[in-house]
Design a protein with these regions (language model features):
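Sequence-specific dsDNA recognition surfaces
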Residues: 14-27, 43-72
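Non-catalytic DNA-recognition/assembly elements of restriction-modification systems
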Residues: 2-23, 184, 190, 195
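A short beta-sheet element
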Residues: 40, 65-124
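Short amphipathic alpha-helical linker/capping segments at the junctions of internal repeats
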Residues: 95-99, 171, 181-197
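A short glycine-rich beta-alpha junction/loop motif
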Residues: 98-104, 135-156
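Short, conserved secondary-structure segments in the cores of folded domains
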Residues: 4, 27-28, 66, 96
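Short, structured motif recognition centered on aromatic/hydrophobic residues
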Residues: 8-13, 36, 70, 74-76, ...
Length: 206
């Protein structure tokens, strides 16, 4: 799997992104069960992983003075974390309707396969890049200039879709907590991480 002969370009996110912007607002006490679907940065750390199509939170759109939205295919980054390994955690939004995006989230628009980008941004190498130069403190921050420097492999859209299809199957096994003991689920998670890194390891950087 790793080292496969596939045409690939290694590109910075700054080269593939078509737009960047930050979310705004949506305090904890402004989250409700009704209203427009929304996402807060903490949910990227605790609730969503790789991709999601529905929000667990909503808010009253009319009460948000500064409105920022995400649409189908956007990549969302949490730019604040308490731990360096989790700084810049990202998730792809693949739902049909626009959602409101809270503060400490950066939205990246692009023309690639959103699931592929999210898998590529979760690899061991990408996580190390996100944390590069960060110093442990009570709260760790990153920003758009730093995110733009992250380098990931970009094969053809057809190859991106092929890789995503394989990883979706492995990833589904790690999230199905209804089957298997905790030890089995942990083994599946390690297997998924292994194949993810292998599939996203190409022979050489261009």
């Amino acid at each position: 799997m790793g080292g496969q002969e596939v045409s690939v370009e290694w590109k910075k996110l700054g080269e593939i992104a078509t737009d960047w912007y930050r979310g705004a607002g949506i305090k904890r006490d402004e989250v409700s069960e009704e209203g427009i679907p929304c996402i807060r940065y903490g949910e990227i750390h605790t609730t969503y992983n790789i991709w999601f199509d529905e929000c667990i939170s909503h808010t009253d759109e009319s009460k948000q003075p500064s409105k920022k939205y995400a649409n189908n295919g956007d990549i969302l980054f949490a730019i604040t974390s308490e731990d360096i390994p989790f700084i810049g955690n990202s998730v792809a939004y693949i739902g049909k309707n626009k959602i409101m995006v809270g503060g400490d989230i950066v939205v990246m628009k692009h023309n690639q396969d959103p699931k592929y980008l999210s898998y590529a941004l979760s690899t061991t190498d990408a996580v190390l890049q996100k944390g590069k130069g960060k110093v442990k403190s009570k709260v760790v921050h990153t920003n758009v200039p730093s995110l733009k420097e992250i380098v990931i492999p970009i094969p053809s859209l057809e190859e991106q879709e092929r890789i995503t299809t394989i990883l979706d199957k492995f990833y589904a096994l790690t999230t199905d907590i209804t089957t298997g003991l905790p030890a089995e689920i942990e083994a599946r998670r390690k297997q998924y991480e292994y194949y993810r890194d292998q599939l996203l390891t190409f022979k050489q950087k261009a």
